[in-house]
Amino acid sequence: KEFDLIEPSRAAYYRREITWNVFNEKANRFANLLIERGIKKGEKVGILLMNCLEWLPIYFGILKTGALAVPLNFRYSADEIKYCVELAEIDILVFGPEFIGRVEEIADEISKGRLLYFVGDGCPGFAEDYNAHTANCSSQSPKIDVNDDDDAAIYFSSGTTGFPKAILHNHESLMHAAKAEQNHHGQTKDDVFLCIPPLYHTGAKMHWFGSLLTGGKAVLLKGTSPKTILQAVSEEHCTIVWLLVPWAQDLLLALDNKELDIADYDLDQWRLMHIGAQPVPPSLIKHWKEYFPNHKYDTNYGLSESIGPGCVHLGVNNIDKVGAIGKAGYGWEAKIIDEQGETVKRGETGELAVKGPGVMTCYYRDPKATAEVLHDGWLYTGDMAKEDEDGFIFLVDRKKDVIISGGENI
């Protein structure tokens, strides 16, 4: 019930707009379609879509049935899609026009016992038309009991070697992500949140969950160019913007080179620049404040295994600690441990471990990998860190080498 949409008249998207009320109706229609097609609580529905107006209603339609939502990375090859469909035991796959070629390549193999729904114009012959099938479904919420400890979603890790791992989360985990986001940034129904990253990623949706919880306006943006971002902030009166480091760097470069002029945009309402998904250079924030001196700043640390961002965050009043990832977030605990799992002394380097309602249930169908990272409710992150004298956590290294590009491990 905490996910009820608070103000049905408030718009939810950029350019193509829908209200929260229509959003909810769309989610209900898809939920009822799934139920008509035999989807039961605990079964899985995959989402292979670019950011679009349909993405989030589809996601919540799945959750309303008690089934599990399984978002897939839009960069996956046909073989990777097939691997994820089979590992997660997906019963229905929803995909968009950008993926026709990849899905068609494996359709004969993955369609055995599975349904394929296509979102968009020109439905291919090997799939069924999402719009046509949902149009006549009931817009009433299905009467399915969903509990906090019920499985809710499977996310796939970025994966540093081989194929990605499947990460299982329950409904409590998703709900806590919404509460943490709202708590960390003081979001109200008057805030307008600009969501730019791909929605298959835990980070994008979990930040957006703050808007869902408050009934505030959310702006879903497809482009990442500096001009597109500033136009969206100006025209939609965005107050909170979540950026990745490359996007912030590109925006500053465009301002430095006089390609853009902030005087051309209405940006006075923009109160918070939120950045994360990879280490943030202090020099970037110093540079940012030259153009936006009144902005609050926050950074979040998180993993897909901790339902994305929020298990550690800097806090909007701690800009003097730029370079740190912060302290344990709302409802979370954090500690730094040695090889034996014992807490190290402040100032010493060890592995960061976190504990809270957003820790994954397990790596789906991989008990060995689960046992390596979950210990008495603590998630061992694989990130090496240390605390300063004030208890702020700084990342030092990875236990294993990894390259981060655009907020993702590769």
Regions found by a protein language model. Name each.
Residues 213, 238-243, 252-320, 333:
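Gly/Ser/Thr-rich phosphate-binding loop
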Residues 136-156, 163, 186-192:
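Conserved pre-ATP/AMP-binding loop-to-beta segment of ANL
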